[in-house]
Amino acid sequence: VSDTKKASDVFIECLEAEGCEYIFGVPGEENLDFLDSLGKSDKIKLILTRHEQGAGFMAATYGRHTGKTGVCVATLGPGATNFVTSAAYAQLGGMPMLMITGQKPIKKSKQGRFQIVDIVSLMEPVTKYSIQIAAGDNIPSRVREAYRLAEEEKPGATLIELPEDIAEEPTTDWKPLPKSVARRPSAEPKAVRAAVEAIEKAKSPIIVIGAGANRKMAGRMLEQLVEKTGIPFLTTQMGKGVIDERHPKFVGCAALSAGDFVHRAVEASDCIINVGHDVIEKPPFFMQDNGVTVIHVSTKTAEVDPVYFPQIEVIGDIGNAIWQIKEDVSPNRDWNFDHILAYHQAELEHTGKLADDARFPIFPPHLVKQVRECMPRDGIICLDNGVYKIWFARGYTAYLPNTVLLDNALATMGAGLPSAMMSAMLYPDRKVMAICGDGGFMMNSQEMETAGRLGLNLTVLILRDDAYGMIRWKQANMGFADFGLTYGNPDYVKYAESYGAHGHRVESS
């Protein structure tokens, strides 16, 4: 019977064939065959975490950094339900991830309904693909399909449920399916020509860089387009760092407030080149029928929206489309960017004063400046969610792509520390800082043990206000009484030391 293989062994071989390096998670009884097969692999390392959510955030961040699918594992029932937030984080944020979950036997007695939840159905709204393996022979095609869908634009989350009895059964069809080399389609030349004509005809074009442009090649092509044409650019929060923000044509990052400097700069333009727009982030402009041309450059056509109806769409691989536009466009001598760039100048003068305000307790713009000064060029900051995220999105100058990891999609709390841990694992020679509020940090602070066990080189900055500050701020803004949002905190210095980390309390600015 030498031509059969145990199904869980086949699963691991398929993951190896896909180039899987790590599996993050908390295995349970229903994963023990899978765990045994994983233990025999010399290519894949198990990273054991203290909560499934931390594992899911790490897997998603692996996908965000590398473009390859991050893999995580959990048991049935409560293990798998703990992945729901991680799945939504990856799905909305465009990060390729595969979750592998256990389940009770499906062919023989389940011993009642203990711990059984229909995880495949539960995950459908927050994944691109959610499937149960009902026969071991299906594993190679299911794994290949999960990877294909996770990584295809727009990337996202996938789930494969591997029941206990299927994991241990012998399979005959066990060869991993090879990846096909699929090139993404190029934009149609007529669409490119229409876009170029509109850009050349405009008086003050501007480029908006969104989440979809934050992929490997698009950044280089965008920089070349800006160099050739001199057209100013701004980013959304998820597009931050695609081009070095010290560039003289950088206008800012659109975060939160309409009517501010960045939005005024966009309003001064008559042609908006919107690159990699993702509806998850509202565009930093609201279209009116006022003669402003909007060009949508993306892998997919624009979703219908009363405030977003681009007149010209250039659909195809984004990097390639930008290259085609750059090759075709002739810079127009009559273009005038003074008005647009003046808003950026005004913003710099405005924030410069704030950043030098050394009051204590520390003032957020001052903190942003201090962090930027101490982080090297390729240093990575990983933001949890709170008011400080807006300050950093707007005020922290990103020099390289993926050096400011923030989540403006699901915008969950609790991902700051796990995303920093993943960054430190992938880039052990780079400085990594997790920047968390006290609320977000405590949601996954147990992963400090994991970070210590893995010997990760990272710093955690906790901004403590003893409250869910973002909501408290909005509560005050909306005229409500201050109620229901404050709490106490542990002594964070002792807390850090209890995990074997160094703890410091900042006593002055």
Where are these regions (language model features)?
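Glycine-rich, anion-gripping cofactor-binding loops and their flanking helix/strand elements
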Residues: 64, 211-295, 399-421, 425-430, ...
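Glycine-rich, acidic loop regions that bind phosphate or pyrophosphate groups
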Residues: 101-142, 239-340
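Active-site nucleophile and cofactor-binding loops and adjacent substrate-binding regions
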Residues: 26-28, 46-57, 72-79, 134-135, ...
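Thiamine diphosphate
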Residues: 100, 108-115, 305-307, 313-315, ...
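Phosphate/pyrophosphate-binding active-site segments
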Residues: 2, 174-175, 291-387, 503, ...
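Structural signature of the thiamine diphosphate
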Residues: 21-22, 60, 64-74, 78-101, ...
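Active-site diphosphate/adenylate-binding microenvironment
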Residues: 8-11, 16-18, 34-41, 345-429
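N-terminal cofactor/phosphate-binding cores enriched in small/glycine residues
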Residues: 4-93, 384
